[in-house]
């Protein structure tokens, strides 16, 4: 997921190492950065999910919210998103959150960028 101007060449997407699996225990989330983009990494029952760390309503960082199961709640106006799909579950907005493909190899978590 990269934005490119008409003058930029299209770059291939690749998996970027972002964290050690052991550093993000089940039921928790953390923030990683790829090319200055904040990505929220969530561990739901041992499965990792990545989404943009920004609620579309007032740009609040979702990583400062609350994770319950597969639902992350925005700390500002309590919009709720499914971390597996980025889909809005409930809240004052109608926009979903972009997600990123995740792969785990050994103890390293990779995000497709």
PLM feature segments, named:
Residues 1-69, 83, 96-113:
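N-terminal pre-ligand scaffold of iron-sulfur
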Residues 55, 74-77:
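Short cysteine clusters
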Residues 69-75, 88-97:
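Short cysteine/histidine-rich metal-coordination sites, predominantly Zn2+-binding motifs
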Residues 80:
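Short helix-to-coil "ATP-lid" hinge immediately C-terminal to the conserved N-box Asn in the Bergerat
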């Amino acid at each position: 997921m990269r934005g490119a101007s008409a003058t930029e060449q299209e770059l291939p997407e690749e998996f970027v190492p972002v964290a050690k699996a052991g550093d993000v225990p089940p039921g928790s989330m953390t923030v990683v950065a790829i090319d200055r983009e904040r990505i929220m990494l969530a561990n739901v029952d041992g499965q990792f999910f990545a989404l943009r760390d920004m609620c579309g309503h007032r740009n609040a960082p979702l990583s400062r919210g609350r994770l319950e199961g597969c639902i992350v709640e925005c700390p500002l106006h309590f919009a709720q998103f499914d971390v597996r799909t980025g889909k809005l579950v409930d809240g004052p907005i109608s926009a979903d959150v972009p997600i990123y493909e995740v792969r785990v190899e050994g103890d390293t978590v990779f995000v497709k960028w």
